[in-house]
C-alpha cells in the first residue's frame, strides 16, 4: 500500500492530548504505523551524564499512531483525506480529496 503520510508533510493532530496542533513529520515508522511529528507528543526522559553531554532531563518527540494525524490541506490548512492519481507524466501523486489540490510538489 502506498504511503499517505511522508517525511516533511505538514499534518494536524486529530486525536489525543495535542489535538488541533500542526507540525512537520520528522520520521515515519511504517512497520509500527507510527510517525514522529515536530512539537507533538513531547516526553521527558532522564539522561545520564556522559563525557560529551551533561545529562539531566531531555525532551523529545515520541511517535504517534498514523490514525491520530491527518494531512493539512495545502489550500486552507484544514485536515483532509488523501487520494492518489496518475499525473500527465505517468507518476502517482497524492492529492487532497476535499480541494483537489496536489500534495506532492
From Swiss-Prot:
Q: Which GO terms describe its molecular function?
A: rRNA binding; structural constituent of ribosome
The yes or no answer to whether the keyword rRNA-binding is present is yes
Offer a single GO CC term for the protein. ribonucleoprotein complex
**Which InterPro entries does UniProt cross-reference here?**
KOW (IPR005824), Rib_uL2_dom2 (IPR014722), Ribosomal_uL24 (IPR003256), Ribosomal_uL24_KOW (IPR041988), Translation_prot_SH3-like_sf (IPR008991)
* Keyword terms, alphabetized: Ribonucleoprotein, Ribosomal protein, RNA-binding, rRNA-binding
* Gene3D superfamilies per UniProt: 2.30.30.30
Query: Which Pfam families would you find in this protein's record?
Result: KOW, ribosomal_L24
Q: Out of the domains of life, which is the source?
A: Bacteria
SMART domains attached to this UniProt entry:
KOW
Q: What is an annotated GO biological process for this record, any one?
A: translation
The record's function comment reads:
One of two assembly initiator proteins, it binds directly to the 5'-end of the 23S rRNA, where it nucleates assembly of the 50S subunit. One of the proteins that surrounds the polypeptide exit tunnel on the outside of the subunit.
Name the PANTHER family for this protein. Answer: MITOCHONDRIAL RIBOSOMAL PROTEIN L24 (PTHR12903)
Q: How does it assemble?
A: Part of the 50S ribosomal subunit.
Q: Which family does it belong to?
A: Belongs to the universal ribosomal protein uL24 family.
Q: What is the recorded name of this protein?
A: Large ribosomal subunit protein uL24
Q: Which organism is it from?
A: Hyphomonas neptunium (strain ATCC 15444)
